[in-house]
Amino acid sequence: MATTILKNEGLDFHIKISTPLSEIDNDIQKELVDLTKKVKIAGFRAGKVPIAIVEKKYGASVRNDIIEKRINDSVNHVIKEHNLNIIGRPKIDDLQNEPNKPLEFTIKMELLPKIDIPDLKKISINRPKLEVSPDDVEEQLKKLAEMMKSYTKESKAKAKDGDQITMDAVGYVKDEAFEGGKLTDFKVVIGSNALIPGFEKQLIGSKAGSEVEVNVTFPENYHAKDLAGKDARFVVQVKAVHTAEPTVIDDEFAKKFQSNSLEELRTHFTKKIENESEEAISTIMKMNLFDQLEKLLDFDVPESLLDQEKNILKSETDKSEQDDSVFKDKSPEQVKEYYDKLALRRVRIGLMLAEYAKDKNLQVEPDDLRRIIMQQARSFPGQENMLFDFYKNNPRAVEQLKGPALEEKAVQHIFDNAVNLKEKKYNRKELEKLLESEEQRITAM
């Protein structure tokens, strides 16, 4: 076998392989001889089939098998001889495979770059710390109490904000009743904003048994396109007005939520608020780490990985329909520049984190996969069991989580052992403002 390096530049390695016809013929003859001892052909005793008969029957398939083996062996030989760290599958080009001629082909391989992990001790990351105040907890308790309100006390007085109205209504557009505009025994709490903007406010002052005319304009983004942006008139028959029975926030209230006391419920809400903030805080810290890594990393990346990442980004953008918000008033060239820059950032950081995980001997454990699945489940409230069943019945889908799980593990290891963390305390409103500004910054990247 003769080899000629055609290209060894950057991350591209191309090499031409030439194998003499004599070597191919020898391999084929050896395989045919072996077959004469194994095959059974009518009219011949086992092991006594003439090689010419075997060659006529199996020659073409034997030759194909030998060629395929030679190609695979050549690829493995080249990788080992030149100590190549390749990505993806080698590509075989310019295959010359005619009978009675030498076997020639070109192996084209894309190499992984040499990655030097930067000095992570030079990186400082702010770690926001939420301080949950008693007022934060009381606000949550009041919201819960509001949800638990009961409207059992019927009122003969005029309806006011916070009262529940039971009504029949018919809606008209240009004096013509429209489909879906009829309500029967419909209940709404004034001020809940459950109906079209302005509807509930016009019910204030009404009484049981009265008729009210409500004039509204459907929002431009209303789900029924034929009504969007149109003026409408509703004739409302107020059937009953109920005032809310006050909910007392005490130990008995707490017991409705599997807590033994009000104090225990307060502790539960404190932890809940802290936990809800942790995921957002982790995202901020991760993006800040990636921002600094982007400035430190400067190595070539494989074109195949870049193209793959661009396709993933485009798919994600199409699904989330962010094109209008992110790329509004942007030219096609600016959109392409955005994708190119973000894809390069993602690939470089992903390769560096993979190298870091390898260097620190980090492995994906079952708990890491469960954590990733639980994170996904929180995005689908009410459908958690469906998601769990999906992964339970799809081992390949679980396998695809190993990459993200290892990246998360590497990031956490960096936070725990490598970079400098500076904790800064925030109250809830300050943290919400920080999260909002960071989300806007990330979206605009």
From Swiss-Prot:
Catalytic activity: [protein]-peptidylproline (omega=180) = [protein]-peptidylproline (omega=0)
Family: Belongs to the FKBP-type PPIase family. Tig subfamily.
Entry domain remark: Consists of 3 domains; the N-terminus binds the ribosome, the middle domain has PPIase activity, while the C-terminus has intrinsic chaperone activity on its own.
UniProt-listed InterPro entries: PPIase_dom_sf, PPIase_FKBP_dom, Trig_fac, Trigger_fac_C, Trigger_fac_C_sf, Trigger_fac_ribosome-bd_bac, Trigger_fac_ribosome-bd_sf, Trigger_fact/SurA_dom_sf
Pfam families (alphabetical): FKBP_C, Trigger_C, Trigger_N
Protein's name according to its UniProt entry: Trigger factor
Highest taxon above the source species: Bacteria
Keywords: Cell cycle, Cell division, Chaperone, Cytoplasm, Isomerase, Rotamase
Keyword RNA-binding: no
Molecular function per GO: peptidyl-prolyl cis-trans isomerase activity; protein folding chaperone; ribosome binding
Physiological role: Involved in protein export. Acts as a chaperone by maintaining the newly synthesized protein in an open conformation. Functions as a peptidyl-prolyl cis-trans isomerase.
The EC number(s) this enzyme carries: 5.2.1.8
Ranges for domain PPIase FKBP-type: 162-247
Places the protein is found: Cytoplasm
One GO CC term, this protein: cytoplasm
Gene Ontology biological-process annotations: 'de novo' cotranslational protein folding; cell division; chaperone-mediated protein folding; protein transport; protein unfolding
SUPFAM superfamilies, per database record: FKBP-like (SSF54534), Triger factor/SurA peptide-binding domain-like (SSF109998), Trigger factor ribosome-binding domain (SSF102735)
